[in-house]
């Protein structure tokens, strides 16, 4: 009878996944610091990236080095932001955000993934209109729904969504009010379990059969690319299955 993965093998896989997450966060910290300066109190994007790093158990020393490299105090790599758009099989719209030090490599890798999985890249704006850019502050079950809602609306949030199945809460904001709402909620004693500025599809598309397999394969391939930070799609996640 065959043996399952060894403890060492599982640990190596876990370490590799953690390393990839750290790499993406460090790139986000670098770009945020270079664009808006190294002081998180005056740079909401940097503050958000730092919080993401700390919540992923990244050390403060690693974060500080990334900031110093970005601001020129230490030698470092310069990354640029690039966005690609396209379609997966079944007409599923996909947005791919990259932070890369080699634009030629990034576009080649993204194009290869689309092609290999039966999709195709589009031009700028070809699918972006199907998504809304917004801030999302997520609170786990157990948060005081009324208190969070009141504090969020007073701080300028656009909407508060409560999920009846588990009691989780999402506070939705415009991108330019995300930082102030997040700070106001923190001051009121409410720290989100997760906070980000993201894209959400206006309408989801359900897929099945071979199409679902190919869509899932494409999204996984894109997520695994070193230059890719985030992948957004309008696929109904439930239709992709396990």
From Swiss-Prot:
A single GO cellular-component term on record: cytosol
Q: InterPro entries from the entry?
A: Integrase-like_N, TACO1_YebC-like_2nd/3rd_dom, TACO1_YebC_N, Transcrip_reg_TACO1-like, Transcrip_reg_TACO1-like_dom3, YebC-like
Protein biosynthesis as a keyword of this entry, yes or no, is no
Keywords carried by this UniProt record: Cytoplasm, DNA-binding, Transcription, Transcription regulation
Look up the record and give one Gene Ontology term from the biological process aspect: regulation of DNA-templated transcription
Primary site of residence = cytoplasm
One of the record's GO molecular function terms = DNA binding
Q: Which SUPFAM superfamilies match?
A: YebC-like
Q: Which Gene3D superfamilies match?
A: 1.10.10.200, 3.30.70.980
The protein's location, in the record's own words, is: Cytoplasm
Whether Transcription counts among this entry's keywords is yes
| Similarity comment text for this entry | Belongs to the TACO1 family.
Q: Which PANTHER family match?
A: TRANSCRIPTIONAL REGULATORY PROTEIN YEBC-RELATED, TRANSLATIONAL ACTIVATOR OF CYTOCHROME C OXIDASE 1
Q: What is this protein called?
A: Probable transcriptional regulatory protein XCC3027
